From Swiss-Prot:
Cross-referenced Gene3D superfamilies: Metal-dependent hydrolases, Urease, subunit C, domain 1
Record-listed 4-imidazolone-5-propanoate binding positions: 90, 153, 186, 254, 331
Binding locations of Fe(3+): 81, 83, 251, 326
Job description of the protein: Catalyzes the hydrolytic cleavage of the carbon-nitrogen bond in imidazolone-5-propanoate to yield N-formimidoyl-L-glutamate. It is the third step in the universal histidine degradation pathway.
Needed co-factor(s): Zn(2+); Fe(3+)
Gene: hutI
Annotated source species: Streptococcus pyogenes serotype M3 (strain ATCC BAA-595 / MGAS315)
Phylogenetic placement of the source organism: Bacteria, Bacillati, Bacillota, Bacilli, Lactobacillales
Note on how the cofactor is bound: Binds 1 zinc or iron ion per subunit.
One Pfam family here: Amidohydro_1
Gene Ontology cellular component terms for the protein in this record: cytoplasm
One term of GO molecular function: imidazolonepropionase activity
E.C. designation(s): 3.5.2.7
Name by which UniProt lists this protein: Imidazolonepropionase
């Protein structure tokens, strides 16, 4: 077979054999590092991988040849938890955070999520589209090729749908692949204050059926937290969403452990997000139910908290984990997955291989894209992040700097030395 594109002489390729399930426990520690590696691409797919000189049959007169001595390649990075589409920003809350005002106290003062809800409700489709596109551009420039994007800053149908429509438009227009999550249950809107059940009924009866009918989202999510939605309320919504055919995610055990992990396990959610306050019993329940733990260390960093999710304990117990940005205007205003990956080493005490497995193959399972992306595997799409680093460890050792040299998306050179092509 003659390749369209042949990428050769990488110092290292980060490869693994996809076992057909998210990596857990000791599997997280394993990968194949191919020295002097090459990748052959045809019709946007990986058709060959190896070490040394490529087979002669891969090279034809039209084959584009590129050498990458001194560089490493990984699968395109996957950010599987973002709040991509929103209006406004919340830098005015930064001084309060520095003064020690808690996230929940800011929310109680009318700030936090509700502040962004007001800004998002007043924002036009074009405003939201352009703002979200800028964030996606930034992510792409840092090696991200697939992004999960939640609604949740409307808390009314008109605005929630506008957010979902923006995600759908960007999925068509932007090189990054987007996976849509419906999260109208991100907070209790002011007009339903004191009556969350009534709001959930509106979501179930009036919103979810339209989202499903118009194929606006693949997943449904809810914020199960103290002063937001209880475990029973979360179970009520997610069970109805599951009956309608949605895959499930849940924000759980971020600030307090109030039963969100139990809901995730009972309903076989694909992932439970945050988990800073998870208990040993909660870890065991998620393992038993096969729920992926989606950890968001940049949120803990941004909130200046001391309690990070117990990633080391989770992996050693046999749990599958991912790492994501939680990109949002309040608790985590970043879109830099390289920073998140480095926090995975510095703050969660994970190894570079564990982090890379978390943000590639496990993240692909978290967004139900494992058949297409998440590993450098023959037959999968050629989503490739190429770093200006001599080896895998350097990517974490030399921190707080964008080390992306190039990005390939579906076999097309999409980012080249700081420029989107």
């Amino acid at each position: 077979m003659v390749a369209d594109v042949l990428l050769t002489h990488f110092n290292q390729l980060f490869c693994l054999n996809d076992p057909g399930h998210p990596l857990t426990g000791q599997e997280m520690k394993k990968a194949t590092i191919v020295e002097d590696g090459y990748i052959a691409i045809k019709d946007g797919l990986i058709v060959a991988l190896g070490s040394g000189e490529p087979d002669a049959e891969l090279v034809g007169p039209q084959t584009i040849m590129r050498s990458y001595k001194g560089k490493i390649a990984t699968p395109g990075i996957i950010d599987c938890h973002t709040h991509l589409v929103y209006g406004g920003s919340r830098e005015h809350e930064f001084a309060k955070k520095l003064a020690g005002v808690s996230y929940l106290d800011i929310l109680a003062q009318g700030g936090g999520i509700l502040s962004t809800v007001r800004a998002t409700r007043s924002a036009s489709f074009d405003n939201l589209y352009q703002k979200s596109k800028r964030l996606l551009d930034y992510m792409l420039l840092h090696g991200v090729t697939t992004v999960e994007a939640k609604s949740g800053y409307g808390l009314d149908w008109e605005t929630e749908k506008r957010q979902l429509d923006v995600v759908a438009a960007l999925e068509k227009d932007h090189p990054i692949d987007l996976v849509s999550t419906f999260m109208a249950a991100h907070a209790i809107p002011e007009e339903y204050k004191g009556n969350p059940k009534a709001y959930l009924d509106v979501i179930i009866k009036d919103m979810l059926p339209v989202v499903k009918e118009e194929n606006l989202a693949e997943f449904c999510d809810i914020f199960c937290e103290k002063n937001v939605f209880t475990a029973d309320e979360s179970r009520y919504l997610l069970s109805k969403a599951k009956e309608m055919g949605f895959k499930l995610r849940i924000h759980a055990d971020e600030i307090a452990s109030i039963g969100g992990v139990d809901v995730a396990a009972e309903l076989s959610a694909v992932s439970a997000e945050h988990l800073m306050m998870i208990t040993n019993d909660g870890i065991a329940k998620l393992i038993g139910a096969g729920v992926i733990g989606n950890l968001l260390p940049a949120t803990t960093f941004s909130l200046m908290e001391d309690t990070y999710a117990p990633a080391r304990k989770m992996i050693d117990a046999g749990m599958a984990i991912t790492l994501s940005t939680d990109s949002n205007p309040g608790s985590c205003p970043t879109a830099n997955m390289q920073f998140v990956m480095q926090l995975g080493c510095f703050m969660l005490r994970l190894t570079p291989i564990e982090v890379l497995n978390a943000v590639t193959i496990n993240a692909a399972y978290s967004v139900n894209r494992q058949e297409r992306v998440g590993s450098l595997t023959v037959g999968k799409e050629a989503d490739i992040a190429i770093f200006d680093a001599p080896n895998i460890d350097y990517l974490f050792y030399f921190f707080a700097t964008n080390l992306i040299h190039q990005v390939y998306k579906k076999g097309q050179l999409t980012v080249d030395r700081g420029r989107i092509l």
